[in-house]
Amino acid sequence: MDQGGLKRNCNRDDSLTFGETAVGVGSDTGDTAGSLLQPAAMHLPSPSSLPQLTVAPNGGAGTKDQGEFGGLFESPRGQCEGSEMKEGKIIRLQKRKHHLDIGMFNMEDNLSLLNQNISDLNRTSTSVISTSDTSVLGKLPLPNLFPQHIKQEGGFSLEKELGTYGGHTGGGPCDLDGNSGHLIEDTEIWQDLDLPNSLPEISDFELDSEVAHLDNILHDSSGGCGPDGSLLKETKVLVGNGGNCTDVNGTDQQHPLQHHQHQQQQHRHLLQHQQHQLHHQHQQPPSLLSSVMIKEEKDHDNSFIHIRTPGVVKQEKQENGSFCQSQCLQSSMSSLHGGGPMSSTMGAGAVPGYHYKASPSSTVGLQDQKPFGIFSNLPAVAESWTRGGRFGEPSGIQRGNDGLPSAAMSPFSVSFSSSSPRTGENSSSAVPGLSKPSGPTHKICLVCSDEASGCHYGVVTCGSCKVFFKRAVEGWRARQNTDGQHNYLCAGRNDCIIDKIRRKNCPACRFRKCLQAGMNLEARKNKKLIKMKVHRPTGSAEPISNMPVPVIPRMPQLVPTMLSVLKAIEPEIIYSGYDSTLPDTSTRLMTTLNRLGGQQVISAVKWAKSLPGFRNLHLDDQMTLLQCSWLFLMSFSLGWRSYEQCNGNMLCFAPDLVINKERMKLPFMTDQCEQMLKICNEFVRLQVSYDEYLCMKVLLLLSTVPKDGLKSQAVFDEIRMTYIKELGKAIVKREENASQNWQRFYQLTKLLDSMQEMVEGLLQICFYTFVNKTLSVEFPEMLAEIITNQIPKFKDGSVKPLLFHQK
């Protein structure tokens, strides 16, 4: 603020008006005070809290008691007197009216007026504005229309002032003009004032940092560290409400000579303050962080922008690339770390600190950088390391004992990455030796690819597969004593995917994969034996030849279930090739059926050779069984296809040959179709399942034998008993109620016995058709050979059926 502000605040008793009254008075009398004070009326308290105002006859404002008590704004410490003050007031009011649009005085327009104001200010020894409880101005907000400088009593002592911030109790706020004392008598009243341009107070810690920073700037100016070595043209430092708060646009510049003397005086007190600060450094709270922003600008040739925010220092060089030393950052870090003092001597050596060099191209779009010095000190575990220079630190500059770890001893990176977060930064990659080792690689289960928990039964597996394999093997051994088969069935083709998610879908494929991985239940016992060998005392060691050698039993092979095998070897559907566009005749239909029967016999032979245990029979026995049961197999398969596809209403010989009711009425077709429909009706009545059908078809293959017996009769009996048990398993799999299993078994075996009578009638028709050449029915070569060998045996009665029930 300019120094003439004190004059403007004197003797307002005859010109100050409030509210709407000021407008009329100012316009009638020509006094500009009314119009000037009108913008401040919006900040006044309610009219009830102020004395009632009246308009004096001379155009001034007053109260009813003005004759008794004098003016409202009369200072209790004394009146400003003299004609020079009144003339100066009139001149200033006219000048304020001329510059009312900008709200402040331009002191550069009239240098003589500035010198006159300074001389008047020096002659003034009392405060201009009353701050007592009874003063109205003490409770009014002062707008920018009343820029003022508070003149105070007493001598100035910067050391006393800094001592207050350093933790001492003593001198109150003071200005930097050489006068000290209490700024006001009642600080609570001033706190209620809403100053438009007032800035918040800063903490003790911030004051020390900014004073040290000012010392650094003075050092650059006096020592020639900057490019031109000139003084700062504009310096704006916030020192709280008790300091000299300058305006924002820099119009309140001081006289050059007075400014130079003021800087020299301030520099001397700064040196005293640093010594005083080192003595009381332990009393400064290190956790206080500044919440204000300090902006420091220089001229256009060498201008810096210094921005201080909590935990961040950002300095930008606009044109050239000279260095700027941040002493305030060092002082703040010194108190944060509790390290040794930071030297700030003014000599040939540069002040140790952090140097930031920035160009306009490199500072555009960059985020605020965080110095690594805010990290806490680490123990000096690497004192033998080579002491390296800090980033941006010129060669030859020795760093003092500032209590901060050097760049070589700090595990934090010296370079500042704008993309990294400010908190929790992990820069361990800067020092490869201190990087954290990567976590241990997890082992994978060889069965389901889950995370393995260890080596179980000789294979690295997870706990789930370990328990599954143990239960599967123990259950398989328990069932081996009864039927010798495992009950795990694969609904697919024994190639299910076993992983962490789908390992429980198919136990059969999971158990197979466990065996393929090499899991062995005896591996646990063998491991215990090996441990016993290692820990056995040497004195009781036996000769190696006498040591029992553990015998690893042969791993059990994965035996597929019988039903799964029967499903796999089931013959494919064969097409007849019948031309349905031509008219149907008995001869053409029977010829097509014989040709289809010949293809089905060939597939039946392949099917029989694929049956488990059938190849164990003698070759003659295999041929005898096929010759005696070929029509059983084809008629039973026809009944299943008709039951499955047509629900027993029609005969489905092939997908392209279905005998409906009309075709059944053809000559020589009715008798055959009636016998075949009986089989279809039995499937419908019993609701035979597919598993039951597969087992019953194998039993039909083994249901007709020669009377003299087979050459491998014992093997035949064993195979037949095996498939009878498989039929029982298929019944148990279907029926939920155990009491109905035997009843179901009885019904199915009765169906097998009834097949003997139904097929016997079909054989008679087949033999008649084959012998009677007048029908002109063609037979395939293989089927003709089978019928030729079978006819004598049936006439002689050399074959007999194997029945489950006696007639």
UniProtKB/Swiss-Prot annotation:
Keywords: Chromatin regulator, Cytoplasm, Cytoskeleton, DNA-binding, Lipid-binding, Metal-binding, Mitochondrion, Nucleus, Receptor, Steroid-binding, Transcription, Transcription regulation, Zinc, Zinc-finger. Disulfide bonds: none annotated. Residues 412-421 have a biased composition (Low complexity). A zinc finger (NR C4-type) spans 445-465, 490-514. It is found in: Cytoplasm; Nucleus; Mitochondrion; Cytoplasm, Cytoskeleton, Spindle. Residues 257-282 have a biased composition (Basic residues). GO terms for molecular function: DNA-binding transcription factor activity; nuclear glucocorticoid receptor activity; nuclear receptor activity; sequence-specific DNA binding; steroid binding; steroid hormone binding; zinc ion binding. Residues 520-553 are annotated as: Hinge. Residues 554-788 form the NR LBD domain. Residues 1-47, 246-284, 412-438 are annotated as: Disordered. InterPro entries: Glcrtcd_rcpt (IPR001409), NHR-like_dom_sf (IPR035500), Nucl_hrmn_rcpt_lig-bd (IPR000536), Nuclear_hormone_rcpt_NR3 (IPR050200), Nuclear_hrmn_rcpt (IPR001723), Znf_hrmn_rcpt (IPR001628), Znf_NHR/GATA (IPR013088). Residues 1-444 are annotated as: Modulating. The keyword Metal-binding applies. One of its GO terms (biological process) is cellular response to glucocorticoid stimulus. SMART domains: HOLI, ZnF_C4. The keyword Zinc applies. Signal peptide: none annotated. Residues 445-519 bind DNA. One of its GO terms (cellular component) is nucleus. Heteromultimeric cytoplasmic complex with HSP90. Upon ligand binding the complex undergoes a conformation change and moves to the nucleus, where it dissociates. Binds to DNA as a homodimer, and as heterodimer with NR3C2. Interaction with numerous other transcription factors modulates transcription activation. Receptor for glucocorticoids (GC). Has a dual mode of action: as a transcription factor that binds to glucocorticoid response elements (GRE), both for nuclear and mitochondrial DNA, and as a modulator of other transcription factors. Affects inflammatory responses, cellular proliferation and differentiation in target tissues. Involved in chromatin remodeling. Plays a role in rapid mRNA degradation by binding to the 5' UTR of target mRNAs and interacting with PNRC2 in a ligand-dependent manner which recruits the RNA helicase UPF1 and the mRNA-decapping enzyme DCP1A, leading to RNA decay. Composed of three domains: a modulating N-terminal domain, a DNA-binding domain and a C-terminal ligand-binding domain. The ligand-binding domain is required for correct chromosome segregation during mitosis although ligand binding is not required. Belongs to the nuclear hormone receptor family. NR3 subfamily. This is Glucocorticoid receptor. It comes from Paralichthys olivaceus (Bastard halibut). The gene is nr3c1.
